[in-house]
């Protein structure tokens, strides 16, 4: 195998999906610890001490203890190159998370074993199922009193509609948690408390019978019965079913104590797929093609206050990036030279010399790159499936200093290009209406406008509950519609015509009266 193909085969690009507070940031930190990317793990709980989780780098995230934006971390493990996309943990940032899932080849689902499958996990799994993304599952927090593990497997199978194949099994839980038993290698790993900040060589015992004294006779007998039950009732691991997205290998542990994470990572790097082929409008692109192709799935403004710029997160789908190369921007039809692409480590930026399929690199963006843009080495090719969602909450932006209107408009449009909020300019007023999927984005925008654009604003209620993008192939009918409904119409930050409805009934009536007009809740970037 050539060096080029070896490099592609090494890549594993994935995201972690979970409900907020299931332990995603903690497990991210432990993975970085195993990949030698950090020397000590700072947990989210240690925020008051000034130790902040490495992946939560934006100021507001540090204050609130949530992962607002997606950061990308690359590190080596088990002879693989891991590209970990850390996704927003807070429920208000689901749109960003959705788009991140378009850039990965597999996903790690973290379940809080105390609470079981939660709402946010269900939504994210639905996104993964659209693309048959392979899923590995980690049942977290077994050092607490959790739900029954068999019950947890049942819940995952019934609610998320995916078969579970337990790879190991917990021995007790809470204060009686003694470790895990490897169902495939007949090996017990014993748990000890107090090793969460380091890589600790937990004691392993080969053969279940040899661990009887270490775990105690009662737990041993319970474990024997449970193992018989699990082997009879659950699915065996099948690699093909996993790769097709029909079955998930399940690992048990506690990320806070760094227990069970290594076993999960070993399984993940062994079974998760290398970069996969990608669908474009024109054809399917294979990862091992020689020419560079890829797409932008995220834009982040002002990642570094020292550099007032924007970075476009670019997923390489095929070929090799080399410093200084020229690439073709499909949407604009122009050539671009990339002299200073970046690689990331949660806010630490360094220039990257080369990149292969599966890698995420940062392109400096001075306003010409948008989410969903495709780049090639000359071929006219656009990758599919990077959506924009209609916001669900709307507010009117009120400017404290009327002389700063230009700066406000610029700031709102630039921040909306990152995809967490959307800005609308109504036809018949000078208002600016901000829309978002959740309430928290409004706080984030106000704070970032103040710190990055020196604009202070507040919000007022606005008579809008729903937004739909308007499309019509008949220009005359579209113009008639614009005249008739100008009181409800606006342009979004990208210039797309949008219908802002005060009520669901209003929207329904408008749709019924205008059958030739398409009212869409999503639009492709």
Swiss-Prot record:
Residue numbers binding GTP: 18-25, 86-90, 140-143
Chief location of this protein within or outside the cell: cytoplasm
Localization of this protein: Cytoplasm
UniProt keyword list: Cytoplasm, GTP-binding, Nucleotide-binding, Protein biosynthesis
GO terms for cellular component: cytosol
One Pfam family hit: RF3_C
InterPro entries linked: EF-G-like_DII, EFG_III/V, G_TR_CS, P-loop_NTPase, PrfC, RF3_C, RF3_dom_3_sf, RF3_GTP-bd
Any single biological process term in GO: regulation of translational termination
Residue ranges annotated for the tr-type G domain, each copy included: 9-276
GO molecular function, one term: guanosine tetraphosphate binding
Keyword Nucleotide-binding among UniProt keywords: yes
Signal peptide: none
Family affiliation: Belongs to the TRAFAC class translation factor GTPase superfamily. Classic translation factor GTPase family. PrfC subfamily.
Primary role: Increases the formation of ribosomal termination complexes and stimulates activities of RF-1 and RF-2. It binds guanine nucleotides and has strong preference for UGA stop codons. It may interact directly with the ribosome. The stimulation of RF-1 and RF-2 is significantly reduced by GTP and GDP, but not by GMP.
NCBIfam families assigned: prfC, PRK00741.1, small_GTP
HAMAP family: Rel_fac_3
Protein name per the record: Peptide chain release factor 3
